[in-house]
Amino acid sequence: MAGSENKARTMQGVVVSNGMDKSVVVMTNRYIKHPKYKKFVRKSTKVMAHDADNACGVGDRVTISECTPFSKRKTWSLVSIDEKAAL
């Protein structure tokens, strides 16, 4: 198909765990409007992402992209480390 582009979703989040080999857990936040009270509420989601170089540390702000599954729970891949955590 000529001109087809990769339309994979990307998200930004914070690394909350890096205790596994080549894997990190990234927490992302999103704001939704409560249907009854009309207040914006923060919802968080934790996803596992593939980190091939083990470059991420806890607290790093990263960008991840959806990809083909690496395992049962790991369907996201690390794109870039946007900001390193302050020590």
UniProtKB/Swiss-Prot annotation:
One of its GO terms (cellular component) is cytosolic small ribosomal subunit. Transmembrane segments: none annotated. InterPro entries: NA-bd_OB-fold, Ribosomal_uS17, Ribosomal_uS17_bact/chlr. Keywords: Ribonucleoprotein, Ribosomal protein, RNA-binding, rRNA-binding. One of the primary rRNA binding proteins, it binds specifically to the 5'-end of 16S ribosomal RNA. Part of the 30S ribosomal subunit. This is Small ribosomal subunit protein uS17. It comes from Hydrogenovibrio crunogenus (strain DSM 25203 / XCL-2) (Thiomicrospira crunogena).
